[in-house]
Regions:
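A short helix-loop-beta-strand connector motif used in the catalytic cores of GNAT acetyltransferases and
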Residues: 51-63, 93
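A conserved beta-strand-loop-helix scaffold within acyl/acetyltransferase catalytic domains
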Residues: 66, 79-86
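Conserved beta-hairpin
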Residues: 59-77
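C-terminal "cap" of GNAT-fold acetyltransferases
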Residues: 3-9, 124-167
């Protein structure tokens, strides 16, 4: 497939109903995909996510629309600003990267991540972080091409592992 050069990218306005509908639709599609856990978003998440996102200034999202497909929303990246105590600067965690199946492999994620990097730099962030599943080799290739590396402090101590505990 050829790369799409005519995407319309924007930072999501959480108060904009069109942006929020696109965000919810894309996020629900991602949640239903095996890479997102294969379960739809809960009714609670769908009902409360717009207000929850708008209430948190340390969150931001990017949308991609394809004008050639009637302005269809085709990509989403959700980001969370954190803080690096070692650098004493903000960092940005790329939390969700979503591209609809019809547009995968066409440069959508790359274009969105370029905008994410610009927005992170404008926030004074020292780095971007993200998690990726071991089986998602296309995403890993993209992230490496964009300069991401596995996290480690001392190679003798190995690479960091992403862990979770549900509360």
């Amino acid at each position: 497939m050829t790369a799409i050069t005519t995407l319309t990218l924007c930072q999501v306005d959480y108060a904009n109903p069109q942006h929020m509908q696109a965000l919810l639709d894309l996020l629900d599609g991602y949640a239903r995909d095996p890479m997102g856990g294969a379960e739809p978003l809960s009714d609670f998440a769908k009902a409360n996510l717009p207000q929850a996102l708008a209430a948190r200034p340390h969150l931001f999202s990017v949308l991609a629309f394809d004008p050639a497909a009637g302005g269809l929303p085709v990509g989403l990246v959700n980001c969370v600003e954190g803080f690096s105590t070692f650098a004493c600067q903000p960092l940005v965690n790329v939390h969700d990267v979503v591209v609809v199946a019809s547009h995968r492999g066409r440069g959508v994620a790359e274009q969105m991540l370029v905008l994410v990097e610009q927005l992170a730099r404008a926030r004074g962030a020292c780095k971007l972080t993200l998690e990726v599943l071991e089986g998602n080799t296309p995403a890993q290739k993209l992230y490496r091409r964009l300069g991401f590396e596995n996290y480690q402090l001392d190679p003798a101590m190995g690479q960091a592992q992403f862990m979770q505990k549900w509360l």
